[in-house]
Structure formats: structure tokens, C-alpha cells
């Protein structure tokens, strides 16, 4: 099942064009020029319809947020949410996680959010998981030392797999929970998260902090965006996030 096409997508995108970064490569190393007063630069991978993006940015107006999403029909909803709230600290990139090192220079990002990514359950597709060791090594190339990855998923198998991957890639784990909202709602939810929480599905969360290493783990170039595209029937659609 693919996401439903949004009507009037092009004119709607045009109305939000000041929130879109058409060529993120040109801003590599200069993102803070967009918001010189920003105390942090945070990147969200797969913002979906942007509820988490907009609400988090609204609570932290002194933080610069860059939301990366490759599904235009989802991204337009996120952009409209941001524009409706009058937020000036959020920008969007129509791009792919595999190209983060093209978009950001070493140490440029303070935090990365990964919320409810595709679990890619088949072992033969393990390298496509956004928490595979190789992706986590890729993120090291844009995070500062001490920078963090905040990861949430409803998929227990993906979560347990990820807990094994983070230390291998040079991150210290903290705030590990397998039932984030067990004692009441904790933090800002995505649309997808709220839906499954209401159904009684436990939400898993952890934080990985980038450690300084004398020798960086070897990064193996990742396949192009087309090879990383979600399969039909993927559990987590951009429409849901």
C-alpha cells in the first residue's frame, strides 16, 4: 500500500517554498547561517507528516531543525503544519539518510531523531535499517562528539537489534525503555506513535551518545536512495509517522 497522492501538491509546495532547501549540498558546513542564534542543530530522518517536528520545534524556538523526508506527499503536510504554526526554525530536505554526509559537514549536527523507521524485517535487508551499524557509522560523520541519536520504534525486534548495533558503532546507550508511555504519555508523540499507543502497543526508546574514538569505525558506502526505497506494504508509511 502506497501513500495516497495529495491533491494540488505542486501549488501547495510552492506556498511553503521558504521552508524547503532545494539543494542541501550547498549548505554543507553552513546550516547555521540560516539561524545564527541557534544553540543546536538537530536532524530528523523521515519526518512523515511532521507532528513531532512541528511540536518539538515550537517548544524549542532556539534550536534549528532540519527534517529529511523523501516522500513529497508526506512532507507537504509537515511543511504546512510548520507554516501554520509560524515556525521559522524548521527547514525541509527532500532527501535520503544515505546522503547525510553530503548534506552536513563533520560535527555539524548536535542530535539526530529516528522515529518509527521501516524495520526491514528480512535479514537480507538488514543493511537498509536506519540503525544498522553502517548507518550509525555514517551518522558519526555528521554528529559532534557527545552528539546524540534519539530512537523510537514500536517494533521490539528492531529495537533489540538496534541495542546491539549502537555500541558496535561507537555509541553509549542510555534512557533505554521498552515501554516509554507505561506510566503515562512521555514526550511528544508522532501520529503513528499515538495510534499504536492507543492500541496498547508498547513504544521502545533509547538514546545513543557518540563517543570519541581514537580510530573511527570504517564506513562502507551505502547503496543509492532507489535501492533503499521502502517496499510495498512496508509497516511504517510516511503517511503514518
For each predicted feature, which ranges?
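Class I SAM-dependent methyltransferase "Motif I" SAM/SAH-binding loop
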Residues: 46-50
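Conserved SAM/SAH-binding beta-strand->alpha-helix loop
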Residues: 71
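A short glycine-rich, Lys/Arg-flanked "PGG" loop and its adjoining helix->strand segment in the class I
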Residues: 131-145
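Conserved beta-strand signature within the Rossmann-like core of class I S-adenosyl-L-methionine
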Residues: 146-153
Amino acid at each position: 500500500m502506497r501513500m495516497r497522492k495529495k491533491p494540488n501538491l505542486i501549488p501547495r509546495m510552492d506556498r511553503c517554498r521558504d521552508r524547503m532547501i532545494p539543494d542541501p549540498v550547498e549548505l554543507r558546513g553552513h546550516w547555521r547561517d540560516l539561524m545564527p542564534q541557534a544553540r543546536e542543530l538537530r536532524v530528523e530522518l523521515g519526518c512523515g507528516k511532521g507532528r513531532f517536528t512541528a511540536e518539538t520545534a515550537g517548544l524549542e524556538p532556539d534550536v534549528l531543525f532540519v527534517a529529511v523526508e523523501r516522500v513529497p506527499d508526506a512532507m507537504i503536510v509537515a511543511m504546512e503544519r510548520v507554516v501554520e504554526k509560524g515556525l521559522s526554525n524548521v527547514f525541509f530536505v527532500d532527501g535520503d539518510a544515505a546522503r547525510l554526509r553530503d548534506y552536513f559537514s563533520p560535527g555539524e549536527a548536535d542530535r539526530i531523531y529516528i522515529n518509527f523507521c521501516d524495520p526491514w524485517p528480512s535479514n537480507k535487508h538488514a543493511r537498509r535499517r536506519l540503525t544498522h551499524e553502517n548507518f550509525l557509522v555514517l551518522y558519526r560523520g555528521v554528529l559532534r562528539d557527545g552528539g546524540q541519536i534519539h530512537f523510537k520504534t514500536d517494533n521490539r525486534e528492531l529495537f533489540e537489534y538496534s541495542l546491539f548495533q549502537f555500541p558496535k558503532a561507537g555509541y553509549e546507550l542510555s534512557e533505554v525503555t521498552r515501554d516509554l508511555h507505561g506510566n503515562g504519555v512521555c514526550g511528544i508523540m508522532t501520529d503513528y506513535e499515538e495510534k499504536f499507543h492507543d492500541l496498547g502497543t508498547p513504544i521502545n526508546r533509547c538514546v545513543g551518545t557518540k563517543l570519541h574514538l581514537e580510530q573511527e569505525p570504517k564506513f562502507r558506502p551505502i547503496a543509492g536512495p532507489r535501492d533503499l526505497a521502502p517496499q510495498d506494504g512496508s509497516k511504517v508509511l510516511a503517511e503514518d509517522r
